[in-house]
Design a protein with these regions (language model features):
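N-terminal Rossmann-like NAD(P)+-binding domain of SDR-like oxidoreductases, especially those catalyzing
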Residues: 1-149
Length: 149
């Protein structure tokens, strides 16, 4: 069975994603959820699936802890949602936003690269707010496919 790490999992949206993954892929994937439990996360958001997931409390900026998590759970894929996203808080303390959103993402990527090796076919999916796509215009559409979800 493959092991998927989902970051930011105690947030409302991500907890619902984790629940969907558990319901849709139970027996195919082990879901390991990772969260620092800051103001944006609530462990009780995961209550519906707490017996079907593995919860890891940690900081995505801590390289050694992230690498230990990859090794301990033999992570095959990462779905990275963890981010500081409240605009008002970003104005009050931009350093924390840069630390989590840039350094944290880099830490997860670097640990994945070292753990999986160069040229690996393992998956790292970075999830972000819709603003990163820019304006679509009158024609076309954005699509994303990830394990059929």
């Amino acid at each position: 069975m493959k092991n998927i790490l989902v970051t930011g999992a105690a947030g409302f949206i991500v907890a619902n994603f984790a629940e969907l993954m558990v319901k849709k892929y139970e027996g195919k994937y082990n879901i390991i959820v990772f969260d620092k439990l800051t103001y944006a996360g609530n462990i009780h958001n995961l209550d519906a699936i707490k017996d079907k997931i593995t919860f890891v409390q940690g900081d995505i900026c801590d390289f050694d802890f992230v690498m230990d998590t990859y090794k301990k759970y033999d992570i095959d894929a990462v779905v990275h949602f963890a981010a500081e996203s409240h605009v008002d808080n970003s104005i009050k303390n931009p350093f924390i936003f840069t630390q989590t959103n840039v350094i944290g993402t880099h830490t997860l990527l670097e640990a994945a690269k070292q753990f999986w090796g160069e040229g690996s076919e393992n998956k790292f999916v970075n999830v972000s707010k819709d603003q990163v796509y820019g304006t679509l215009g009158e024609k076309g559409y954005f699509t994303e496919k990830f394990w059929g979800v």
